[in-house]
UniProtKB/Swiss-Prot annotation:
Protein name from the UniProt record: Large ribosomal subunit protein bL19
The encoding gene: rplS
Residue runs in coiled coils: none
Pfam family of the protein (one): Ribosomal_L19
GO CC list: cytosolic large ribosomal subunit
Alphabetically ordered keywords of this record: Ribonucleoprotein, Ribosomal protein
Similarity section: Belongs to the bacterial ribosomal protein bL19 family.
Amino acid sequence: MNIIDRFEQENISKRTANKKIPDFEAGDTVKVTVKIVDRSIEKDGKEKLTERFQAYEGVVIAKRNRSITSSFLVRKISHGEGVERRFMTYSPIVHSIDVVKYGVVRRAKLYYLRNRSGKSARIKERHIPIAKTKAAKA
């Protein structure tokens, strides 16, 4: 293992010490909680930082596994418009990732969902036995 790989592995282990990243694939519906920091200037000129968490729920249409630069693309329909957002898997901005539903798809990248709407954009649900889900949570 060279120096760069070792550095990336150490960095990943530091970033995942507090949070658990579940196994998910393209087609799964995930809920990503993101930390948002707002900066505002008060009347007396002081800068005020406020933190809040925002949930983003949608279907994973692509996943990119590249060690520390791994990312995934989530698509949701908001007010009739398709919205896509890419999240860096090991980013400190990503607070948590929860799998809501597991989907059955035959592709690794689901970019064809961009051209579909309504019933044709649905994804079948994959049922996982209870024993596996309990073992994964423990």
